[in-house]
Amino acid sequence: MLACASALSAPAATWVPSLDVITDKACYAPGQMVTFKVVGTMPANTNIRYRHGLAVVETAQLTSNSWTWTPPKVDYQGYMAELFTTAADGTETIVGTIAVDVSSQWTRFPRYGFVADFNDYNKTVDKNANIKTEMAYLNRLHINGVQFQDWQWMHHKPVKFNGDGSLTQWYQDISNRWVGVEYVKNYIAEQHKYGMKSIFYDLCFGAWKDAYKDGVKPEWALLKKDASGRFYQDYHGLPSSWASNIYLQNPKNEGWINYMKDRCDEVYNNFDFDGFQVDQLGDRGEVFDCDHNKVVLYKAYEPFLAAMKTAHPEKTLVMNAVSGFGTDSIVKDNVDFCYNEVWGNGNGYGGAAEQDFANLYDIIKKNDQCSNQQRHTVFAAYINYDKAGNDNRPDTKVNTPGVLLADAVMFALGGSHLEIGDHMLTREYFPAAPLQMDDDLKQRLVHYYDFLTAYQNLLRGTSLDQSELKAEVTTSAADVAITAWPPKAYTMTTFAKRIEDKDVVHFLNFTNTDDLSWRDVNGTRPAPALKTDIPVTVKVARPVGKLWVASPDIDGGAVKELSFKQNGSDLSFVLPSVEYWTMAVVEYKNVEDNTEDGVQTNEGIAWSVKDIIHPQKSSDANNSTIYNCYNLAGISVHSSNKGIHVGKGKRLL
């Protein structure tokens, strides 16, 4: 079959990133109004276009630096707002972009951040001003959940009370840092203003020394056995200058579970937290209960999580699967999304080595399978780890290429990255901030998180098992070798999914590196070699209607529709550019059999019921009004740009 090149629906756009655009919230409920604001001077005759993927939902002219928009009442959708001007010859110039997430539950598309400093240092810093600045940046990244690390007093007694039952306003955490209750609460309030959820952190089995004074029983302890056969309580050693080591309890012990349920009640009764981030310490080897029976530790997490969820079913519950330890038990029932702290020397997932980019795929694949394709993955992955721990490091900057390539791969695979708080996370001790982001990285992350949010339905709308596609992609370019996933040194790596009537092909740029680890431990990853005008041929399944690309590295993530040629199963086009990551989306035509008796659609491509289409004037692909068709109420589609048109006198079969 031979098809001609498609026509572009609009003149090519240029990119002038002159406007800083913000929204009033990180995410929105269906039907909730979005308020936009432009910081700076907006060009005359600026228009805004709201897209869901390629489809234009609405276009309007802007007459003020602040305006509102109400997205369609469809749950779990991402949109990109493009601000643009149009010259006399029809050329568009895009002057700003920002994403919008419409989701009733934040855990459907979690974008997780953190906070870990609750001190004003004897009033030497304006902590409340810092809180506002930090949360405004997280809001610009559409961070919809925030983990509170090391906010608590003691792990076994997170809330500290005075003798009269009132909250102690200042206390010291395990590292002897001061924590101000006022600032914990102000962080929560500021996050809620932006529609974010506030999640408190604690271990599932940790207690300080002398915890018996607070009601922790010796018979709850988790034990180990030394070479002589002597049993002793397992513990996590900490610096001698800290308040205590952490002594481990048996997480399935009913007494300990009930004790921690009471402590969680105290947390929720005194702080407006929205959930519990449960932590563990990975594989502890052979461990025992107080009767010297072996404890299968990863299985012991199940009753603990079940009890926490039953006690507070309305609250978010998340647990860390450290290097994959306990994944099967953790993600199956009670948690709301998958959270994986990944390192470089362990691997509880199988497949590639834990430090490799390829292992990120293995993690998501296993999480999808263990959660019955129901829960998405967040990586707690510490970039530039060795540089951050080196007192003789040459500089104190986070390496931008290391961050962007790691995020590109994580996002393309369908995950997200816990990395942003008041600093970039580079060590497992969240309060540590040895490396800082420069302004360029901060701005580039805005585009990356816009991209993650705007295209969330294509990136994270389905699991790998449901959508993974072994795309066949070739190029005639002499300076580019294209290979399929997993990444290979000095190549352009592709990863693909088939989602409904679209093939989504990600191009990830490894062309100038043989470092295939996401960790960039020493902060030495070089910037990629920008590749432009790459001739590409992709194998496709049927006639193609439209082709478009988008990248967080160019045009603020805005859509660029491309021309193409199709010869049978070969789709040929020119890929405009790949710096770190470019996404190409192939949209297939809908195949119909227009007979005298009825209209038929091929098996396997019919849309499923989700929302009702109410009668309205319909449009064809070129936005020209169609009057000789009926709209059918009661037929549901997945996104606002799709519809089913049946000619007069026809039947839908």
Q: For the regions a protein language model found, what residue spans apply to each?
A:
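Aromatic-lined carbohydrate-binding/catalytic grooves of carbohydrate-active enzymes
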Residues: E134-E182, G206-K225, G237-G255, L281-N293
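Aromatic/acidic polysaccharide-binding cleft in carbohydrate-active enzymes
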Residues: Q280, Q374-S463, T511
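Active-site neighborhood of glycoside hydrolase catalytic domains
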Residues: K252-F337, W343-D362, Q369-N372
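C-terminal outer-membrane/trafficking sorting elements
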Residues: N594-L653
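An acidic-aromatic substrate-binding cleft motif
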Residues: I94-M154
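Active-site-adjacent "subsite" loops/lids of carbohydrate-active enzymes
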Residues: S104-N128, F200-F271
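Carbohydrate-binding surface patches
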Residues: D479-R542, T582
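C-terminal beta-strand-rich structural cap/linker in extracellular carbohydrate-active enzymes
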Residues: N567-D593
